[in-house]
Amino acid sequence: MKKILALILALVMVFALVACGTTAAPAATEEPKTEEPAATEVPAEEPTEQPTEEPKTEEPATVNADDIEDTMTSADGKYEIAFVTDVGQLKDKSFNQGTFDGVKLYAAANGLSYKYYQPANGDQATDDDRYDAMKAAAEGGAKVVVCAGFMQGTALAKAAAEFTDVKFVFIDGWQLGLENVAPIAFAEEQSGYLAGYAVVKEGYTKLGFMGGGGGTNPACCRYGYGFAQGVNAAAKEMGVTVELKYSWQYGASFQASAELQTMASGWYENGTEIIFACGGSMFASIVAAASANDASVIGVDVDQSYESDTVVTSALKGLVSATEWAIDKFYSDSWAEVGDVATTLGANNDAVGLPTETWSLTKFTVEEYEALLASIKDGTVVIDNAALNNDEVVNAGLENVTIIYE
């Protein structure tokens, strides 16, 4: 009997141990649950880094925006992401195209529909024309509307106040007092400075600047003002005085024109060696003049060396990555970080600079450029950004630059 009782007790203990073993199973299933929130937190932080790193280094290497169609047909006839162009052509190889590339890349990567809208009347578009384009985008199903250029301001203030459920990204913009508008600006003076410094170090002594917007476009003014400062800094280091012709003529509409090409040709024929073409489609006229005179060009906004062998470098700003970053603020539920918040992207965001992938300068090296860029980032080199109009350059006190305003 005692043996039977002992056997029963032994079995009870075995079952108890088995029972203890089965209670351990839920503990094993609970571990992934405690880890999952940590896994979801990482993507939530990534958008803050994307504009300075990921879009610039990874996406261009794997996806070419030119391989993505400019137009698409959505299944429901609605388009979630819209782009309203600035004056000039959509495919201007510069400001409009760079911004739209950001729209296309983000939409394609995330399976979203997109569409571009061009205000009526081309380079003669009015604020009403721009508003109509924004209204069409909002009524066409847009959740995010990207508007390029400072001229969009008046129309955008009206459209955003009317379509409060739609988010608007204002590239080259400023605060409008509306939480559904994210203004994104750039430190173009830094990029212009780098370009001016580089070409003088390369040996150019007779330079030109042709700007768009008639001297009223803040971004173009900053480019030009920074360019003149960079030219002066390099000339001072080299102990030389250089010539800088400076003009806003024929660029008010940012378009190519026979008049602009004739003026650029005249500059080249009279000794100008290189012109900073700062104004969208104006680039085509200046390149044509440079090609005819065996001269050189500095591109703007994007790397324009792909368009012509006359381009020795380009003053860049990160239109593609900034556009993707701003759109993602909506889709990552982080709009509060940018809505009615003044955002200026510069060297410290890796948002301005010169293209090193297509470097063609021989006397001014990539290493020297990177050292100069680092000096801007750490504050050793300070660039004035107070340019309001072309007169600021004339009166800037640039001791080693002779400015000829035309």
Enumerate the predicted regions with their spans.
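C-terminal motif of bacterial Sec signal peptides marking the signal peptidase cleavage site
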Residues: 16-19
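Positively charged n-region of N-terminal signal peptides that target proteins for export
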Residues: 1-11
